[in-house]
């Protein structure tokens, strides 16, 4: 399907065949349910245990960590405007970089990664930007994200699955990185699920290493406008002017946390509805596959 197959054939110097045709599609939930035994392992399953149970009939069990987690997770730092948030992000990176602390910044898009890189360059800070364009090269770059003084900017999907070691891939400068405070994770947006934010936080503090994570967001971010944060916050509590400082009103911060729970609940409900809609098609699929299997095994014949 698409142009991937012809592109690979041309690259390898073989005869280019016609494009493939999609003969059938199996939703992920039903595909996984076809396995007689189903299990998985992830560091962020607990926050989605309701979804695992309702969609896959799977329970979540927490396995104690081998060593205690020493990472310090700071609460969300919320600003009124995106401009104030952008300034706060740069001001957070500057002192960390000055003391040689490695920094990994997570952004929601390639464009925002490049914008942040330009702002840091104006401050004399050189950063490595990962934008999911070259997985092999970027995997090598992110392995070095734990080296002292390194600043790495990663778009949402890039660099996943790579273990970041303090001091670099060979850990030759680990003592220096530890002395600087370990890997600082800086999130610049709130995910639509707690799991997403925990995945970013979890890039630091692995295997008992020290580290910290911060999230700097604003009331103008996409998730806030999508779920109309302004309507959730009582008028007397909604900030009227940007002060350049984080919002400390507990009512505002409570509603900011609530936004993520609303988004996560909406996503779960959407998946549950899709599951119901595709159930009918799956019954037909089971019937067709059953007949096909019977023909292939000789248990049935065509009249």
Over which residues does each language-model region extend?
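Short glycine-/polar-rich loops that comprise or flank the Walker A/P-loop
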Residues: 12, 36, 56-58, 100, ...
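Conserved motor-coupling elements within RecA-like helicase/translocase cores
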Residues: 93-100, 110-182
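Generic beta-strand/beta-sheet core signal
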Residues: 41, 63, 106-108, 123, ...
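Conserved nucleotide-binding/hydrolysis micro-motifs of P-loop NTPases
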Residues: 3, 24, 37, 45-47, ...
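A contiguous, basic/glycine-rich beta-loop/short-helix subdomain that forms a polymer-engagement track
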Residues: 1-83, 87-89, 132, 143-144, ...
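C-terminal helicase module of SF1/SF2 nucleic-acid helicases/translocases
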Residues: 175-303
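Helicase motor core with emphasis on the C-terminal RecA-like subdomain
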Residues: 50-75, 84-102, 111-126, 253-261
């Amino acid at each position: 399907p698409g142009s991937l197959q012809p592109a690979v054939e041309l690259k390898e110097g073989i005869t280019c065949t016609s494009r493939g045709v999609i003969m059938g599609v199996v939703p992920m939930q039903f595909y996984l349910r076809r396995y007689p035994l189903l299990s998985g392992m992830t560091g962020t399953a607990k926050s989605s245990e309701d979804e695992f149970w309702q969609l896959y009939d799977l329970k979540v069990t927490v396995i104690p960590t081998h060593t205690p987690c020493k990472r310090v997770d700071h609460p969300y730092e919320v600003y009124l405007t995106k401009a104030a948030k952008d300034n706060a992000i740069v001001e957070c990176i500057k002192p960390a970089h000055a003391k040689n602390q490695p920094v990994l910044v997570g952004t929601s898009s390639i464009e925002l990664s490049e914008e942040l890189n330009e702002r840091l360059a104006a401050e004399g800070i050189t950063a490595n930007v990962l934008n999911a364009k070259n997985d092999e090269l970027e995997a090598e770059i992110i392995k070095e994200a734990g080296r002292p003084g390194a600043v790495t900017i990663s778009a949402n999907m890039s660099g996943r699955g790579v273990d970041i070691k303090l001091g670099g891939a060979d850990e030759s400068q680990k003592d220096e990185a530890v002395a600087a405070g370990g890997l600082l994770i800086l999130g610049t947006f709130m995910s639509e699920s707690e799991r997403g934010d925990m995945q970013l936080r979890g890039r630091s503090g692995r295997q008992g290493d020290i580290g910290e994570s911060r999230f700097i967001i604003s009331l103008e971010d996409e998730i806030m406008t999508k779920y109309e944060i302004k309507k959730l916050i009582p008028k007397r509590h909604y900030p009227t002017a940007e002060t350049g400082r984080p919002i400390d009103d507990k009512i505002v911060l409570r509603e900011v946390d609530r936004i993520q729970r609303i988004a996560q609940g909406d996503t779960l409900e959407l998946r549950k509805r899709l599951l119901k809609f595709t159930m009918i098609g799956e019954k037909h699929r089971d019937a067709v596959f059953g007949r096909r299997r019977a023909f292939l095994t000789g248990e049935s014949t065509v009249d």
